[in-house]
Amino acid sequence: VCVRLARNLFKTSDFIQCRRVILAVSGGSDSLALLFLVKEYLETLSAPLEIIAVTVDHQLRKESAREAETVAKICRSHHIKHITVRWEGKKPKTHIASSARVARYNLLVQEAQKQGASLIMTGHTLNDQVETYQMRSQRLQKRRGLLDDDASVMRDGFSAGGFAGAWRGEVGAMGDEDHAKETRKNITEKNDGVLYERGLSCIPREALLHRKIRLIRPLLGVKRQTLRNYLSIQGKMWIDDPTNEDRNFERVRVRQSLSSQKLADIAQKINQAALQRRQHAQNIADLILALDIRVQYGRCFIKKPASLLHKNACFPFVVGLFAVLMGGGFYLLPSKKLSMLVQKLCLHSSEKQRFTYAGCVIEYNKDGIALWREGRNMKEALVGTEETLIWDGRYKITNHGSEAIKVGAANLEQLKSLLKNSNFNLEKPHFPSLQSLLMISNDKGYDIPELISQAIIHKNVIIKRIMAPFDWLSSREDAALVNVVEPFFNLEVKR
């Protein structure tokens, strides 16, 4: 029974090109079951991988150190390598659960890199998945009035056809009123889908951490009780975390309200939501490929598309996506902001219009839409030796040099001097967007890596353009979308 359970949980592709796997093991029933199931499965392979069990001691409860040692003893008795890592430093007073989650995954990634492991597995179960769905669903229901208001605005205030009208220079009606009504209906429904099913797809089985370490949760389809039965059959005990019964936590209250039948019903909804999210991601990716989009020197330009494309219900989402990526935002636009963006874009005029949104300047005219980083709140920072800094949500700078470097936005005077005195030839330079580019400097001079092919003053520095919403954790459900967008921001400069 145990071997059959293990074989049904894993795919051959889970362990492809992998020499070591990090298992996050807290000592609870879920993670201990994961530990032994992975061990049993790997023993059936011709070339078993090395298992490294990692316990994260968040140092939030006095029992945590003892629990980590208990896990270490269990691992020693089964000849499994075990490491305890600790969340050091001052802990936040609010949002402790989400902060602990970020710290936990960061520590796991650090240990994976240290151990030369390309895969992390965690013991999230079907119960975790259903609880997450229920919590998110309840939050959406609480905001139902707001969402209804948004839908009303979508019906009455804009339509995808508005993009066509604006580019044709029309004022008022779109011409084909039946088509306009149908488009308004479609964009309301489909944009609701793009946004709301993203969250309700909940925890993905596979994701990418820091754009380099695979994260797999193989137990998402298994009930917690099944895993406990599996452990009990083998005579193995687990640690019960007392916070799992503390009704001060929303998840505990939701957990205690779920019946077995409700668990099964919600599981079906989650699977459907995940399929929809994957399809929406593919639809958005297909639209991006069909559009004429250029990203260069801090400026994105979406050329006026053919009629069929700018009436596509995903078009506003694409504009919002590139606004976030150009503006350095860490999150995709929520429904309310997306609907407001579309209202602003539906300008029935052929003249140039400009507004700021999501930290981005959006300029709209008969030729298309231009987007670049808004020229404020780009703060200077220091990157010390052997430090990595994410600057402005757009650049990741790693300093392997012998001295600290200063990073900030490109200066107008220095930009003009650079363009005048270097061999760099830029026809009709757009200085507002050029000023959003990263500049590194010290007392000896400055360097704008995207404009200069060779380092002027800095050595041993790596600069990478990132997509903040997908940089820390990227869901497998969004793979089609991320794979299409990534080449637009595929900049890595090594000095």
What is each PLM-predicted segment?
Residues 1-196, 225, 233, 444:
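ATP-dependent adenylation/nucleotidyltransferase module used to activate substrates
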Residues 117, 125-177, 183-331:
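Flexible helical/loop "lid" subdomain adjacent to adenine-nucleotide binding pockets
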Residues 3-4, 65-69, 94, 225, ...:
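Generic alpha-helical secondary structure signal
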Residues 6, 13-26, 52, 87, ...:
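AMP-forming adenylation/ATP pyrophosphatase catalytic core
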Residues 36-41, 84-93, 120-121, 213-219, ...:
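Bulky hydrophobic/aromatic packing residues
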Residues 41, 103, 111, 206, ...:
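Generic structural signal for bulky hydrophobic/aromatic residues embedded
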Residues 93-96, 250-252, 416:
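Short, solvent-exposed polar/charged micro-motifs at secondary-structure junctions
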